[in-house]
């Protein structure tokens, strides 16, 4: 029977939890601020861990500054996490900004704008409920004759 969870996935989940705790409680660097650890991908040989993070900042310069602070502090963070996890080899941590949350919010705003635009047009030209199936049939008949 195949394993339900691979070892790398279990380690990635534990690493994600431990990183979240360390970044929240143990990091005193004011440049970093509030960080959310979205996901962790661990290489098969457990030598590297790609950590996907997001910040509450939308300004690209501030995001890059915070990411650089995390990258600079990565060896220290690795040491803190290694003390909390029982691994023979602690993966080298590489922080990556995860823009999927920001992109998701942007897409959601675009969809909301389109829906509001459609509602405004519907109110301006009359609701779709005013159009009956007879009107649609008549429109189809006139198109066929032309």
Curated annotation (Swiss-Prot):
Is Cytoplasm set as a keyword in this record? yes
- Name recorded for this polypeptide: Ribosome-binding factor A
* One GO molecular-function entry: ribosomal small subunit binding
Xref: NCBIfam families: rbfA
List keywords of the entry alphabetically: Cytoplasm, Ribosome biogenesis
Q: Where is this region: Disordered?
A: 122-146
- Described function: One of several proteins that assist in the late maturation steps of the functional core of the 30S ribosomal subunit. Associates with free 30S ribosomal subunits (but not with 30S subunits that are part of 70S ribosomes or polysomes). Required for efficient processing of 16S rRNA. May interact with the 5'-terminal helix region of 16S rRNA.
Q: Name one Pfam family in it.
A: RBFA
Start-end of Polar residues biased regions:
122-134
Family that this chain belongs to:
Belongs to the RbfA family.
Bias class Acidic residues marks the residues at: 135-146
Q: How does it assemble?
A: Monomer. Binds 30S ribosomal subunits, but not 50S ribosomal subunits or 70S ribosomes.
